[in-house]
Amino acid sequence: MSDVAAEHVEPGVDLTIVTLRFDSIDDASLLAVLSKYIVLTRMHDGCRNVDLCSSVSVPGRHLVVQKWETPEHQRRHFDSATMIDMARSCDGILAGPPDIDLWDATSAHDLR
């Protein structure tokens, strides 16, 4: 993290943030898959929070925002059965591959 970015992060808050953006061709099916995934992911070791957001301006677009205690927790989750099951369940219900991005916690606040 750059020195400038580090100045905006609260002391002691070190998060690994991941976003997954999905564009569906079968919205009801995708929401069912993602809802199950969110519940199971929240139980994973190191998960700080997971949110599911739906776009108001682009119908069928959904965003999953994950916060992890460490990069190792996030990597373990991406290799987990929960993640693999979610990915397999998305077969045939997405307009294209999901957009997955890793974020730097430039300004983060932890409510814990």
What are these regions (language model features)?
Residues 1-13, 51-60, 86-112:
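Glycine-rich beta-strand-turn "strand-cap" elements at beta-sheet edges
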Residues 26-28, 72-74, 108:
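Residue-level signal for secondary-structure boundary sites
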Residues 9, 32, 36-48, 67-101:
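An amphipathic, aromatic/His-enriched active-site/gating alpha helix that lines ligand/cofactor pockets
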Residues 21-31:
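Short, surface-exposed ligand-recognition loops at beta-strand->loop->(often short) alpha-helix junctions
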Residues 14-21, 51-78:
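Short, well-ordered beta-strand segments in beta-rich or mixed alpha/beta enzyme
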Residues 18-20, 76, 80-85, 106-112:
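Short flexible/disordered coil segments
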